[in-house]
Amino acid sequence: MSSTRKFKKVEKPLSQTRHYSLCIPTTLVSDCRNLSQITHKVYQVAKFASLFNVSEVVILEDNSQVDATKKKISTAKLILALLQYFVTPPYLRNTVFNEKFRPYLTAASKLPRLSTLPFTRYQKQDHGRYREGLTIKMQKPTLARKKIGKVFKQTKYINIGKSKALALQSQLVPINARVTIDTITRKIVSPQEAYGDFTGLDSQYGYYTRIASSFTDLFMKGPLKEGYTQSVYVPLTTRDTSIPELSSLPTAETNPHILLVFSTWDTLARAFKLDQDQFVDCQGPQEFFDAQLPCPVSNSDVADAIPMTLTTLSTVF
């Protein structure tokens, strides 16, 4: 009898769903007094984003908060690093985050893992068939390639957090990419194949993150070529605007991607004013939103407004 264990793949059809992007301002942490408080506030955002299958988290930089002192790291970059840290497998963190960021991640390292992420199901990391990995440069490029001066942009080697890199069976992939690996077949697989039986799946690493340094960047530099299907403003304070209240969402069958912007009106107005020369015929930020969804509790904190809003969207619409 063979001692080789046979693994059976179980693939489930993906259900059609709505995809959400969250936009949070850097004022998220304006009331925090130290790194520990900032870390806990961002952890709440990461926890609810992963719980509700959020696809993207955008950090809107409030330029009015930038002070004259020279900081080693900006508030936006700190929030970004923390958000990425919470969705990075423990065995890859030393690779992903260089020494510049590690002093800012000490408090984050003491917090519990996000249990909704597929790759946290195995407490003993070596027991999982599927692992997250980072593609790294070929270790020994051929002399022929060196002579003709070609840049080595593809690789078969994957850093999966072990002492030795994994070599793919018959694939070449771009370097510096995040991938999901089947360690038995030594092939890159889709997140659906690896984690399709796990509640909370939306992408292989939880959510995509980016910084919007301006109002223009928020809408024009997203990951979707066709843009967002619908943009919804979630006011954090009571303020009359001409934006109509949300009455419906695109049907799930169309796989829509909805942008939810959590902010006070003053923050949005400041960001728009700084970019006003880009929108000559626009009267204000209200023209960029299809609807607004007031938070059940007025004057809410961003971290509190996120779960309330996502719960409303998942139950009412």
UniProtKB/Swiss-Prot annotation:
It holds the Pfam family Methyltrn_RNA_3. Coiled coil: none annotated. Its EC number is 2.1.1.-. It is found in: Nucleus. GO terms for biological process: methylation. GO terms for cellular component: nucleus. Keywords: Methyltransferase, Nucleus, Phosphoprotein, Transferase. SUPFAM superfamilies: alpha/beta knot. Its main location: nucleus. It comes from the Eukaryota. GO terms for molecular function: methyltransferase activity. Present with 2540 molecules/cell in log phase SD medium. Belongs to the class IV-like SAM-binding methyltransferase superfamily. This is Putative methyltransferase YMR310C.
